[in-house]
């Protein structure tokens, strides 16, 4: 086994069930921290600090930093880190189940202030974790995440492209999305089998296309993109009649990727006002996109 693919880094063995790949390329680390641009006095939260590749250089620039770490061994290492321990608040918990709203509200943020979230996210939880965080968009200033490059392409996609999908719409509904930099597998130990990229998500201060209930935005995008090869006349036939779609200015021959976020918001708001008599999807919409 080559050193690059070794699962052991700085004395810690990467755990597959936690999706651990440890960042070690100093140039990449410098570029990510520069993009985050942490300042003293800001509320900074890192998800999945791991062995501290981002934690250490960020903590050099600030006095306080909160981290959420599920791996008990890594949390213990951070508690005994000679430089970090007095600066860190360590939350040893699964970020997917953590009540971020309760924590954010405990910070007593001032008007216009928000939490700055960042992390090298385990790729096996990155999408559901972002969906979890979108629920607290009103309390977040920005987010910087290392993700699979393919996921970043989907986050940043425009209509009429193959990458455009439900993830695109839900992310851009809540946030302005900007790619920051691409990262090769060699920047990690063990090296992942895919390319990575860093993305910046900045929650809109005012939602550009607000919906009355985000459930219906989830609902209509799930149904449309689960059948993305079908025309919308057919894909959405259990939710809308052809006449209703036309009244909402939807081309019956369009496909899911042809509609804008504004189009989907219009459909979602119509469904809120005119819900189907039977909605057998209510319990099965999830975040597997």
UniProtKB/Swiss-Prot annotation:
S-adenosyl-L-methionine binds at residues 21, 23, 48, 69, 94, 120. Specifically dimethylates two adjacent adenosines (A1518 and A1519) in the loop of a conserved hairpin near the 3'-end of 16S rRNA in the 30S particle. May play a critical role in biogenesis of 30S subunits. It catalyses: adenosine(1518)/adenosine(1519) in 16S rRNA + 4 S-adenosyl-L-methionine = N(6)-dimethyladenosine(1518)/N(6)-dimethyladenosine(1519) in 16S rRNA + 4 S-adenosyl-L-homocysteine + 4 H(+). Keywords: Cytoplasm, Methyltransferase, RNA-binding, rRNA processing, S-adenosyl-L-methionine, Transferase. It is found in: Cytoplasm. CDD domains: AdoMet_MTases. GO terms for cellular component: cytosol. PROSITE patterns: RRNA_A_DIMETH, SAM_RNA_A_N6_MT. This is Ribosomal RNA small subunit methyltransferase A. Belongs to the class I-like SAM-binding methyltransferase superfamily. rRNA adenine N(6)-methyltransferase family. RsmA subfamily. Signal peptide: none annotated.
